[in-house]
């Protein structure tokens, strides 16, 4: 039996600035068992796990985000979300169970 890769790299179907498009794409792939971890300019890396029903939210941030990121991540955590990665260090990716 062939062993399946745990990390998958996919070409992003929309611009990294199309946050609604990326959120929908990430949610669709989570249903197939691929969970976003990191993105580059054109590609996104996913970790393979059991399929799940997640909703994603991209929150804009800037390159000087350390304090802001800590505060924002804590606010999202209290609301039931967890940080899942980032897009170009311009957006923080949050995920929550649908």
What are these regions (language model features)?
Residues 1-98:
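Terminus-proximal functional modules
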